[in-house]
Design a protein with these regions (language model features):
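Structured, active/binding-site neighborhoods that engage oxygen-rich ligands
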Residues: 1-110
Length: 110
C-alpha cells in the first residue's frame, strides 16, 4: 500500500467513523451509556454492523438524522473533521511557530 493510499484510507475511516457516531452523539452525551444502549436496541441497530437505523427521538434531528442508515446523501459537516482539516492547514501555514492567536484567527477566517 502506498503512502497516498494509506492517507486516503485513514481519512475515509475517520469520516466513516464520525458518520457512524453522529446520529447518537447527543443521545450519548445527554443520556449516557444506558440511554445510548436503549436507543440502539429500540431502533434495531444492535448488534452494530452498519449505520444506525432512524427512530424518532427528541435529540435526533438535522444533520444527525441525515446520518442514519438509508437517509445519507453525503458526509455531513462535522466539527471533528473540520478541526482536523483546519489543524492541517494551520500546520502547513505556520509550522512549529503556530500560536494560539493563529488558531483564533484561523477559526474566524474559516
Amino acid at each position: 500500500m502506498t503512502h497516498e493510499e494509506r492517507i486516503r484510507a485513514a481519512w475515509q475511516g475517520r469520516i466513516s467513523g464520525c458518520l457512524l457516531g453522529k446520529p447518537v452523539e447527543m443521545i450519548s452525551m445527554r443520556e449516557g451509556p444506558q440511554g445510548l444502549n436503549t436507543f440502539l436496541q429500540d431502533s434495531g441497530s444492535l448488534p452494530l454492523r452498519n449505520y444506525v437505523n432512524y427512530m424518532e427521538h427528541e435529540l435526533l434531528r438535522g444533520a444527525n438524522k441525515r446520518c442514519c442508515l438509508g437517509m445519507m446523501e453525503r458526509a455531513e459537516v462535522d466539527d471533528d473533521i473540520t478541526y482536523l482539516v483546519l489543524a492541517l492547514m494551520m500546520m502547513e501555514q505556520y509550522g512549529l511557530d503556530l500560536s494560539t492567536d493563529d488558531v483564533a484567527r484561523s477559526w474566524i477566517n474559516l
